[in-house]
Amino acid sequence: MQQLANQLFQKTIRRWVPFWRDVSPQHDLLKKLSLDPNLNAADEKVLLTWMDACLKDNGGEVAARMRAAELGRRFLDLNDEGRVRFLTLMADNYAVDEVRLTQVIESWLAANSSERTHLEADLRSALEPPRMKLLTQFNELPQGIKFLVDMRAELLRLRKEHPKLAPLEADLKRLLSAWFDVGLLQMEEINWRSSAELLEKLIAYEAVHAIQSWNDLKNRLDSDRRCFAFFHPNMPEEPLIFVEVALVKGMAGNVQELLDEAAPLEDISLADTAIFYSISNAQKGLSGISFGNFLIKQVVKKLQQE
């Protein structure tokens, strides 16, 4: 199943590239960003210049989006070593400006109450690392939010071996926590008539009881079963978390009874119990951003209406 998940990730990457090429038309500056997959020392200097240009909005908002799109495309072209260097550059060079922050804090401490009101905005600005603006530019691009979710998944994987990346990961988590507020998510039922792409992802993302085959999946989506997932408006066909439910009369002795493909269908008109036998977080990059309890509450409400 891990191999299938990796294949889906690569398929997603191939979809991003044309999207991002569309917002990166031919431009003299864009032609200069050509990076070795390992991101060598010379490339690092070019990359820093490029990131600076993104942050300064040279040429206006459209040009900044074009640069951010090209930056994202080049990140996807890097190998593991190159991505570590890319992320380390962001972490090291675009953190909070400690000198400016110290100056603002000293001004705030020396100010009277009325002056502090005006300095609060300066303090908030000084606490915001420049890389937050760059991450936000990625989010504004087609498939950008999925790009950032997967970037955080990489940061979570890398931060133990590369502790310098921890602050960047924390910044990205803060952004994603706001963008994935439960009020923005949409609950949808998944059934056997859902798209093949979505069903394929259920197989890949199931984290509790592995789905062994398409027949196994079909059994879990039969008339006496329910499957619900949360989706983000900017990540269609990408479940964030999903729950599998069995509608039965009484209680099952064990989960194997629920997964038995040879078991007869339950008459749902007689069902008096909903067994939530599996809940899976589908996006590693959203780890620590909890909406499982809210999904369960929504599903319970939906089933009560049935």
Which role fits each region the language model picked out?
Residues 1-306:
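Extended, composition-driven regions rather than compact fold-specific motifs
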